[in-house]
Amino acid sequence: MKKLLLITATFIFTALSLQAQRGYSEFENEEGMKVMYRWHRLSVFNKDSDAVLNLRVTNERETAVKWTFTVGFYDGQQLVYESEENTLCFRAGQSRRGGPAGLRFSLEGMKMEDVEKEAFSWDFGIFDVDEVDDCN
């Protein structure tokens, strides 16, 4: 019985982990920071809710780093949104993603159909990585 319970728990954990990774696209790997992203609606149940950019960032270095960045949304060459400057500390090999990590961005009134247009793009305005002794 314990073995069956352990196998079931392992299966559920694996399925949840895979679900959490699903849907992310690779953006870039710069200065030892691997960036992946995905777009989704703010409310899964409301087709008219705003589009949200979720980032998943991994420090692929063997040292801790302080990462300072801004995110910008563009309509063609026109900047329509820029986030405030953010700074996060990552231990060696650490990954973070989504809202709780401060890696979720949206612009009020911007819908999924807007981000799917050919003229729409997003990029980092600031992308600075500095090695630190430790994350406090």
Q: Can you name each region flagged by the protein language model?
A:
Residues Q77-D114:
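Intrinsically disordered, low-complexity Pro/Gly/Ser/Thr-rich segments with frequent PxxP/GP/PP motifs
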Residues Q21-S49:
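Low-complexity, acidic Ser/Thr/Pro/Gly-rich terminal tails and inter-domain linkers that flank the onset
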Residues G102-N136:
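Terminal connector regions
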Residues L4-L16:
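Sec-dependent N-terminal signal peptides
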Residues L53-N59:
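Short, well-ordered beta-strand segments enriched in hydrophobic/aromatic residues
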Residues E62-L79:
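Short acidic, flexible loop segments centered on an aromatic residue
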